Amino acid sequence: MHAKPRPAATPEQALSAMDQLIATHLVGQHEIAQQVGLSVTDLTCFAYVIEAGENLPTAGDLAARVHVTTGAVTGILNRLERAGYITRLPDPTDRRRVRVAAQPDAVARVREVYEPYYARLTHLFAQYSPDEIAVLHDWFTRASTLAATYLEEHCRPD
């Protein structure tokens, strides 16, 4: 696919568009969390468990990712486990720790809610050239790293 001409934009316009996207996503996360019977924080934690795949995270890993205390993440995991979203498994290398695994049926339920939106995003990506997709991927990856670093430096839980 050849790149379509795109309108010129300044960094300020791009940041404004990004702010609009983030705001819309925040509203969407609240709506989706309600649909699946979770809080936004619990849904975010579950998403990190899914993202980890076979590399099962510990409670400490999740606390760091969600930027909550280990005590708070215990409550999150208790709610997720009671609701059938996760299972806690003993850590094979450290008996004091547990690993967190997503329940396959819960993963399927959450993906079913997101699937129509991701299909639309896939259609949108199809309107861009491979080089443009590479730029988008690079920008999202670097912006995610920057955001995580900023959170680490400025927003640590007590």
Residue ranges of model-derived segments:
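C-terminal regulatory/oligomerization modules of transcriptional regulators
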Residues: 1-6, 133-158
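N-terminal leader segment of winged-helix/HTH proteins
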Residues: 1-36, 83
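C-terminal ligand-sensing/allosteric alpha-helical core of TetR-family HTH transcriptional regulators
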Residues: 17-28, 45, 113, 120, ...
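N-terminal helix-turn-helix DNA-binding core of bacterial DNA-binding proteins
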Residues: 29-68
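Key DNA-contact positions within bacterial/archaeal DNA-binding proteins
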Residues: 71
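Charged, amphipathic alpha-helical coiled-coil/dimerization segments
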Residues: 79-134
